[in-house]
């Protein structure tokens, strides 16, 4: 679990809680649904760094339930990236995102997966959403 970052529609439903976005992101450091361990200042710094990468640092203190579905998805994506996983499993990662955000997130995924020892498994109904880092794909 420690080496895996994961986003799915099921995870999205599990997080329909009234927690600040920063806590949801920080829960990715502990592989938990919800935050049960108070993060250290350097961990909060890492969370904020990743929120900046995704352009959502202004949402840090907003509660998840007050965010749009696209903003919620971005928070969950940041949660998946925050621990620098070796394996990213992204199930419909672009669901709820507008075209501009899809392109931004696809570029982030590409940059991340070009780093050494990174693997991406992604599920999508739309082949045009596949990042360029994808080397193998299966159409069903």
Residue ranges and their predicted role:
Residues 17-34:
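Q-loop/switch helix immediately C-terminal to the Walker
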Residues 26, 41-59:
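Conserved ABC ATPase "signature" region
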Residues 63-67, 71:
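Conserved ABC ATPase signature
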Residues 77:
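Hydrophobic anchor residue at the start of the ABC signature
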Residues 84:
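Conserved catalytic motifs of ABC-family nucleotide-binding domains
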Residues 88-92:
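Catalytic Walker B motif of ABC-type/P-loop ATPase nucleotide-binding domains
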Residues 99-101:
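Helix N-cap at the start of a conserved alpha-helix in ABC-type nucleotide-binding domains
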